[in-house]
Swiss-Prot record:
GO terms under cellular component: plasma membrane
Cytoplasmic side: 44-68, 173-273, 317-359, 413-501
Lineage: Eukaryota, Viridiplantae, Streptophyta, Embryophyta, Tracheophyta
Name of encoding gene: MLO5
Name this protein carries in UniProt: MLO-like protein 5
A molecular-function term among this protein's GO annotations: calmodulin binding
Membrane topology reported for the UniProt record: Multi-pass membrane protein
Length: 501
C-alpha cells in the first residue's frame, strides 16, 4: 500500500506537486490561462466598442472597473504568498476567542458546524514549512483554512462587482430610453410646443396641476406626497418637458434643436464613472462591516437598513425639488407665455451641492452590492443554514431588501438624479467637450469664408452670456456651443448638438 518516495495513495492524504502527473498540471494550467485570456479579450472588445461609439464616459468607467479588479488581484496575491506567515502569528487566547462570527457551539446538533472546506483544505501553498505552533495560552491569529475562505471572498467581490455594475447601467439606460418618445415628440412639434403666442393660466399647465394641490400647502404632507410619488411614477411627461424647456432656456440659445434625452443619457454615463469606483472610504466601510459582524450583536441587521432608507430619502428629495419648482412658478406668475419656465439653481439641493446626492447613491449601491455578495459567499462556504444565518427569516428579508434597493436605485433614483441635477446652476462640460471643438471650428470656417467674400459681412460673435435663471460661467464650453449658429444647409448633416450615437 505504501508508495515509494514522496508518493501516496488515496488513503494517505493529498499528493504534492512532485508526485502529480505532468499532464494533469499542464491541463489545469492551460484551462486557467485560456479562461483568463478570453476574459481579457472580452473586456478589451467591450472597450473597443465604447471607443468606436464615442462612449467616453463608459470607457472610463470600464477602465475604473479594470483598476478595481487589479486591486482585488493584488489582495489575492498578498493573501496567497503571505498566508503561511500570517497563519504563524499568535495572539493571546482571550483575544483569539473574542468577537467571533459564530458562537462556540452554534449548530444544528448543538455542535459547532465546520465549513465544508475544512476537511480538504489542510494543505500548504507556495511554501514547504507548516505554520509555527503557538505556545500554551496562545492561538493562531487566523488559520490557513480561514485565509482560503477570505481568498474566496475576494473572488466573489470581483465577480459581483462586475455583475452589479452592468446591472446598474442597464437598468438606468432602460429607464432613460423610455423618455425617447417624449423627446421625439417635442422635436417634431417644436414650434407648437414652444409657441410664444400661447398664453395660459399657471394653474392650467400640466406641470403645475400635477404638483400643486392641497397636500402641498403643509410641508409634512408635501414630503409624504413626494415619498409615494417616486415609487408610483417618478418622471411624468410634463416633468420631462418642463425641465427640458428650463435647461435649454437657461443654458442654450432659444429655438436651438437639442436632443435633451441624449444629453441625459450621456450625463448618466458620466455619473456611472463615479458609482462603479471603490474609494478608500468604501474599503474602510468593508472593514467596519466585518469587524462588527459579531455573533449576537445584530449590528449588520441595522446596517442593512441604511441603503433602503437613504434611497427613499433621496428619491423623496428629488421629487420635492420638482414640486418646489412648480410651486415657484405658481407664486411668480398668474399667466405664462409658452411653456412654464423653472428656476434653475443649486439651492434646491442639500447644502447647494448636487454632487453630494451622487456620492450618497454611490455609497448605497456599493453597500447593497457588498451585502448581497456577502450573503452568497456565506451560502457557498458555510451553507444556507449556517450559524451566520441563525435567524433565517431575517436573512431572507435582508436579501429581498437588497434586490429591491438595487432595482429602485438603478432604475428610478439614479435616472431621476441625472434628470433633476440638470436643474442645477451648471452643466456638465465633459458631455460637450468634443462638440464644442467641432462647433468652434465650423464657426471659424464660416467666418473666414464670409470675410473673404465681397459684400458679405462677418457672422456675429457667439453670444457668451448665459440667459437669466442660473449662475453659470459665462464662457463655459456649453454656452459657446449653444450659441454657435447652425446654417440651415448644415442641419441635414447635424440635426442637433448631440448628434453622435
Amino acid at each position: 500500500m505504501a508508495g515509494g518516495g514522496g508518493g501516496s495513495t488515496s488513503g494517505e492524504g493529498p499528493r504534492e506537486l512532485d508526485q502529480t502527473p505532468t499532464w494533469a498540471v499542464s491541463t489545469v494550467c492551460g484551462v486557467i490561462i485560456l479562461i483568463s485570456i478570453v476574459l481579457e479579450l472580452m473586456i478589451h472588445k467591450i472597450g473597443e466598442v465604447f471607443t468606436e461609439r464615442r462612449k467616453k464616459a463608459l470607457y472610463e468607467a470600464l477602465q475604473k472597473i479594470k483598476n478595481e479588479l487589479m486591486v482585488l488581484g493584488f489582495i489575492s496575491l498578498l493573501l496567497t504568498f503571505g498566508q503561511n506567515y500570517i497563519a504563524s502569528l499568535c495572539v493571546a487566547s482571550r483575544y483569539g476567542h473574542a468577537m467571533s462570527f459564530c458562537g462556540p457551539y452554534d449548530g444544528p446538533s448543538g455542535e459547532s458546524k465546520k465549513p465544508k472546506t475544512t476537511e480538504h483544505l489542510e494543505r500548504r501553498v507556495l511554501a514547504d514549512a507548516a505554520p509555527a505552533q503557538c505556545k500554551k495560552g496562545y492561538v493562531p491569529l487566523i488559520s490557513l483554512n480561514a485565509l482560503h475562505q477570505v481568498h474566496i471572498f475576494i473572488f466573489f467581490l470581483a465577480v459581483f462587482h462586475v455583475i452589479y455594475s452592468a446591472i446598474t447601467m442597464m437598468l438606468g439606460r432602460a429607464k432613460i430610453r423610455g423618455w425617447k418618445v417624449w423627446e421625439e415628440e417635442v422635436i417634431n412639434d417644436h414650434e407648437m410646443m414652444n409657441d410664444p403666442s400661447r398664453f395660459r393660466l399657471t394653474h392650467e399647465t400640466s406641470f403645475v396641476r400635477e404638483h400643486v394641490n392641497p397636500w402641498a400647502k403643509n410641508r409634512f404632507s408635501f414630503y409624504v406626497m413626494c415619498f409615494f410619488r417616486q415609487m408610483l411614477r417618478s418622471v411624468r411627461k410634463s416633468d420631462y418637458l418642463t425641465m427640458r424647456h428650463g435647461f435649454i432656456s437657461v443654458h442654450l440659445a432659444p429655438g436651438m434643436k437639442f436632443n435633451f434625452q441624449k444629453y441625459i443619457k450621456r450625463s448618466l454615463e458620466d455619473d456611472f464613472k463615479v458609482v462603479v469606483g471603490i474609494s478608500p472610504e468604501l474599503w474602510a466601510f468593508v472593514m467596519l462591516f466585518l469587524l462588527f459582524d459579531v455573533h449576537g450583536w445584530y449590528v449588520t441587521a441595522v446596517i442593512t437598513m441604511i441603503p433602503p432608507l437613504l434611497t427613499l430619502a433621496i428619491g423623496t428629495k428629488l421629487q420635492a425639488i420638482i414640486s418646489d419648482m412648480a410651486l415657484e412658478i405658481q407664486e411668480r406668475h398668474a399667466v405664462i407665455q409658452g411653456m412654464p419656465l423653472v428656476n434653475v439653481s443649486d439651492r434646491h439641493f442639500w447644502f447647494s451641492r448636487p454632487a453630494l446626492v451622487l456620492h450618497i447613491i454611490h455609497f448605497i449601491l456599493f453597500q447593497n452590492a457588498f451585502e448581497i455578495t456577502y450573503f452568497f459567499w456565506i451560502w457557498y462556504e458555510f451553507g444556507l443554514r449556517s450559524c451566520f444565518h441563525h435567524h433565517f427569516a431575517l436573512i431572507i428579508i435582508r436579501v429581498a431588501l437588497g434586490v429591491g434597493v438595487q432595482f429602485l436605485c438603478s432604475y428610478i433614483t439614479l435616472p431621476l438624479y441625472a434628470l433633476v441635477t440638470q436643474m442645477g446652476s451648471t452643466m456638465k462640460r465633459s458631455v460637450f467637450d468634443d462638440q464644442t471643438s467641432k462647433a468652434l471650428k465650423n464657426w471659424h470656417k464660416n467666418a473666414k469664408k464670409k470675410s473673404e467674400t465681397p459684400g458679405q459681412t462677418q457672422p456675429p460673435l457667439p453670444n457668451l452670456r448665459p440667459k437669466t435663471g442660473g449662475d453659470i460661467e459665462s464662457a463655459s464650453p456649453a454656452n459657446i456651443t449653444a450659441s454657435v449658429d447652425v446654417k440651415e444647409s448644415d442641419q441635414s448633416q447635424s440635426r442637433d448638438l448631440l448628434s453622435g450615437p
